[in-house]
Amino acid sequence: MIESKNQSFFPNRFDCVVVGAGHAGSEAAYIASKGGAKTLLITMNLDTIGQMSCNPAIGGIAKGHMVREVDALGGIMGKVIDNTGIQFKMLNTSKGPSVWAPRAQAEKKEYQLKVKHTLEAEKNLSMRQDTVEELLIENDQVIGVKTGRGFEIYTNHVILTTGTFLSSLVHIGTYQNENGRMCEPTVKGLSKSLAKYNLKLGRLKTGTPPRIHKNSVDLSVLAIQDGDANPSPFSFSTEKITRRQIPCYITYTNVETHKLIHENLSLSPMYSGQIQSTGPRYCPSIEDKVVRFADRERHQVFLEPEGYETTEIYLNGVSTSLPEEVQWKLVRSLKGLENAEIVRPGYAIEYDYVDPTELKPTLETKKIKGLYHAGQINGTTGYEEAAAQGLVAAYSVLHSLKNLDPLLFKRSESYIGVLIDDLVYKGVEDPYRMFTSRAEHRLLLRQDNADQRLMKYGYELGLVDQESYDRMKDKYERVNSVREKIYQIPLKPSDEFQNLLDQKGITNYKFGMKLDSFLKRPEIKIEDVEFMLPEVSSWSESEKNILEMEIKYEGYIKRELETIQWKNKYLDLAIPEDINYESIAGLKKEAIQKLKTHKPMTLEKAGQISGVDPSDVDLLLYHIKGKRKQEAEAS
């Protein structure tokens, strides 16, 4: 039992208290304080605010979309990575624009310090180095927290962003230690406090790979992976990335690596029974990869530098909790790493989380008013997912403090909406990671138009300034104006046009056809027709891409918007009690099983079942509508 202390020497009443200062906590503390709430951020170590505990990178498939959404809403992650990145890439550019995604390697320590300095500059934000061991609750309402050193701090809004620190346990072979990260203490009291108020807790597991010394690697024999020559920023406020970029490198596991892993599987905590918790399905350990994909002769390994000055390299793709001596052999079995020195071992970590179905879409707990959860405490994995949740929780606190109706992010308007919807209605069975495939309306949720979709919400709360908001509106007014012009411009003979036709090898065209039809050809880019649109020549690459995509995918976008309206109309559609799910062509086996078990009464309820995807709901809708039409015609 922690003895309470009377603390008159520093303020002990706040509008909002944020517990934990990882990516969820940093975003939550920034948004709450920026929005005018007197906020306290409590973390066990002020030197690890914004720390990249695992990979030194931000963004990626779907994750990059969320970073841009967080930025559009006034968050800090996009700005920080633009200022601290060491390699920038736009992923998936060979595919459709809906899945293009920015990713950047970070200068790891610089990123962390930039987050800390950004928070320190907020006038409404105080910071304390301590832990929180107990929630103070009266009549199912949070009234404050009690810290590890016995101080009581009072507030009606608490955001828990505890990461992997709740009753956590680190594993390296048979070695175990109660750490939240390697060599950092766990927090036990808070788990007990949550359980005391009947919040459903579970256990999850994650892991991290070893870090190696750059000077012990023969980089000359490895494949080089460079960044983009013209990198795209994450933040809508960043005009251009001018930082020096450095390469990553690629190697592969091999037969020797796999043999070594198989021979030592009994020493892996995951396979010895030492770890019982569920790990991330989409970020498996190297042990899992070798066992689950036994037919694969090799697995790709990325060597990612952790900064300009440090010699540490992150081995992306080799997450492991094997004993350290085995890790050394494993690493040295890789091409180019025959003499590699491990400076930090890989490890697995088990930790408590709270079932996210305990939450409202605002991320407030259903059982305790004023208590919000964000990040890995909700069963997610990833910096970007955490940042998005921290922002949502802080938005909810601000709306509560200002007596505004809560802001509920829709699946049809943001990846953040998809994330929150999946968590609170479907829950998690393993650490949740965002993918573009989770968003049924991803063509509308492109990374380039996050400002158009969401910036208005940040502006309304004072989190986005007038200049940024006006700049966004001006941008889309320009795009819309030129788009309307494109519909009217006929193709006419000219030397420039003939040169373009010859260059592209185009013969099947007609003079008089409108420019929009010509632009819809896959080989034609907006830059190719700038001689017809001189005003576009001064635009940014992003603005040109937006214009081009809206022309090329006009039909698909229009159909998607119509589908959203149509589906919203039928969310309350009743599912017949005698429905035969097995008879619905295309319905997945898992969906059939879950639907038969839960027996949802409406389409909306069906979509809230874990294992039932949006595509399954679409099939249900078409089936029910088809059946009704047949019955109507028969009668």
Curated annotation (Swiss-Prot):
Record InterPro entries: FAD/NAD-bd_sf (IPR036188), GIDA_C_N (IPR049312), MnmG (IPR004416), MnmG-rel (IPR002218), MnmG-rel_CS (IPR020595), MnmG_C (IPR026904), MnmG_C_subdom (IPR047001), MnmG_C_subdom_sf (IPR044920)
BP terms from Gene Ontology: tRNA methylation; tRNA wobble uridine modification
Record's subcellular location: Cytoplasm
Record keywords, A-Z: Cytoplasm, FAD, Flavoprotein, NAD, tRNA processing
Residues reported in the UniProt entry to bind FAD: 20-25
Domain of life from the UniProt record: Bacteria
GO cellular component: cytosol
PROSITE patterns, sorted: GIDA_1 (PS01280)
Any one Gene Ontology molecular-function term assigned to this protein's record: flavin adenine dinucleotide binding
Annotated positions binding NAD(+): 279-293
Pfam families, alphabetized: GIDA, GIDA_C_1st, SAM_GIDA_C
Residues passing through the membrane, by range: none
Needed cofactors: FAD
Function noted in UniProt: NAD-binding protein involved in the addition of a carboxymethylaminomethyl (cmnm) group at the wobble position (U34) of certain tRNAs, forming tRNA-cmnm(5)s(2)U34.
Assembly, per entry: Homodimer. Heterotetramer of two MnmE and two MnmG subunits.
Family affiliation: Belongs to the MnmG family.
HAMAP family found in the cross-reference section: MnmG_GidA
Record protein name field: tRNA uridine 5-carboxymethylaminomethyl modification enzyme MnmG
Species: Leptospira borgpetersenii serovar Hardjo-bovis (strain JB197)
Organism lineage: Bacteria, Pseudomonadati, Spirochaetota, Spirochaetia, Leptospirales
Gene: mnmG
